[in-house]
Regions:
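Conserved FAD-binding catalytic core of PHBH/FMO-like flavoproteins
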Residues: 1-52, 56
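Short capping/connector residues at structural and topological boundaries
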Residues: 28, 42, 83, 108-111, ...
Length: 223
């Protein structure tokens, strides 16, 4: 939580910033709120040196957060697993949301999955009460629907965070890919469907772009 001047708050009022290249294997963001800005950084790396310094650098150099009045730091790991054999229940309890390790590996988003797993949990709890059906069915449904799709999100995440500029140029900046991600956010498609559509289109382009980049590096550094 970052408290800034009224002028800075107004400047960010209708804008959302998601910026690559500042954090290794991750991104930085700024979201407007009623009386402050929600700012932060995230990374797919399990360990990174001087992580807080990257946040301070970002805030000190962005016009809408520079010389901020007050900063409240919060942070926690985002657990995710795409193992379709993960058990997230007993016969008396179920895990939902972050506790069930259903965070999107690509975006770090977890609110949707928290709500979705809670909805599915209620269904299976009611079946447990009314028909004495096993809550193992809850784990099975989460693994077959949500977690199996996060497997493909992880594929996108590994590619994007390893080659951010390349994947941005070939994918994000492309209107077709952009539209697919919009459909994903609206719940009109899944990561698996996106992967199956985009892989044959971009795998060859990505290989060619990678080879060109490798050739440039070779020419510059290897004599």
């Amino acid at each position: 939580e970052v408290y800034v001047s009224d002028k800075q708050l107004a400047a960010q009022e209708n804008a959302v910033n998601v910026e690559m290249g500042i954090v290794p294997n991750g991104y930085a963001w700024i979201f407007p709120k009623k009386d402050h800005l929600s700012c932060g950084i995230g990374t797919a790396l399990t360990k990174i040196n001087k992580f807080k310094d990257l946040l301070y650098y970002y805030l000190d150099n962005h016009p809408n957060t520079k010389n901020y009045k007050k900063l409240i730091l919060k942070g926690h790991p985002l657990p995710h697993s795409y193992s379709v054999e993960l058990v997230i229940n007993t016969e008396r309890a179920v895990l939902v949301g972050d506790a069930a390790s259903v965070v999107d590996p690509l975006s770090g988003e977890g609110i949707y999955y928290a709500m979705k797993t809670a909805e599915i949990a209620v269904k299976h709890i009611l079946k447990k009460i009314s028909k004495n059906l096993s809550l193992d069915n809850y784990s099975d449904e989460i693994n077959k629907t949500i977690r199996s799709d996060l497997y493909y999100s992880d594929k996108f995440a590994r590619l994007f965070y390893k080659f951010p500029k390349l994947t941005y140029d070939l994918g994000v900046a492309n209107p077709i890919v952009n539209k697919k991600f919009q459909d994903l956010l609206r719940g009109k498609t899944t990561y698996k469907e996106m992967y199956e559509i985009l892989k044959p289109i971009y795998s060859n382009k990505f290989t060619q772009a990678t080879l060109k980049l490798a050739d440039k590096i070779k020419q510059k550094f290897i004599k």
